[in-house]
Amino acid sequence: MNGKPAQEGTPIRRGDTISTGQNSDAIYVLGDNAFFQKADSRVDFGKSSAATFLRVLAGGLLSVFGRGKSHLATYSATIGIRCTVCYIQAEERRSYFCLCYGAVVLQPENGQTVRYKTTHHERPLWIENGATSPASVVNHTDAEIIMLEEFAGRSSPFPPGGSTY
């Protein structure tokens, strides 16, 4: 975290950056939100309450959010969510977004705002150059979502064991 190794229980504060290495993942819980940060990823937490809650700068982040509004961002989109589970994978020129379940307001950079709801991975997207295009479900599983929901003190609507894609 912030260029130094983190230990279990290390607090995460506004302005912190969490990076994972090639063979490492990180799981962290902030209030009623839980996150599974994949290998080779970098996530930046906003510096003020007016800032974006978190920005996925590189790699993948599976997130489960409790009640209330949250905002995420990548280089190619700003994402407003509420009581939602999503997976984001940020690449240099494009981003992958899967609304696993919940509701989203998606604003691609220089593109039109898209609002939608899903119940089970119905609309994964690539976001690039202000446009969205259909995608397959990649790099996250129902079992990971079930695990994160348990860390956040909730149960998932998916059956135990979940699906793999």
Residue ranges and their predicted role:
Residues 1-17, 21-165:
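Flexible, surface-exposed loop/linker segments and immediately adjacent secondary-structure boundaries
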